[in-house]
Amino acid sequence: MIHVLKTWSEYFEEVFMGHKTFEIRKNDRDFTVGDILILKEWNIYTKSYTGRSLARNVTYLFNGGSFGVEEGFVVMSIQ
């Protein structure tokens, strides 16, 4: 499945540079390994999209409820 996600500029840039290889999100979309995330850069000051986007594959899921991750959230490894 493909998920289009709003991503703040500071985090978008870290994914773009390859430094950030995970996403933490509310799991209200039933994310699964193999999903594609389309990360669209969002400027929080202008409250608008910048026009930049990235596609990343979900390679691993950690469901919340333990190890400090809140129930209902998911940590996704992305490539």
Predicted regions and their residues:
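Catalytic phosphate/metal-binding cores of nucleic-acid and nucleotide-processing enzymes, i.e., regions
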Residues: M1-Q79
